[in-house]
């Protein structure tokens, strides 16, 4: 079911970390995908006894380095990307979107950014059964609008 959403695309901001500990921000319409494909992860995952999700690192042959994931579903998507010949780069949690959505400021850290031959691909990993939840549907709708306004997939 499509969600109608109002997003102020002109003021949407992308925040990223060029290196661990640093933070930079840019209007989304002015951000360079090349800069984001070199970004450090926005956050790192935590391990603790009894945690419900499955975090870890995966050695990616595409990246020639470890790539983090926060769930088994993210790991499955990471594996698919690593074996997809069109994917040239894989960056975990590369940036945070901040935008005015439905007259309220919202933030979201995307799961992955893939550099492909056809351009950047933003990946948010969501279990299929959660897509009917109104909050998840809204999140996916407004992030999709920003991504598409940049000419990305």
Q: What are these language model-derived features?
A:
Residues 1-153:
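Electrostatic, structured charged patches in enzyme active sites and in nucleic-acid/phosphate-binding
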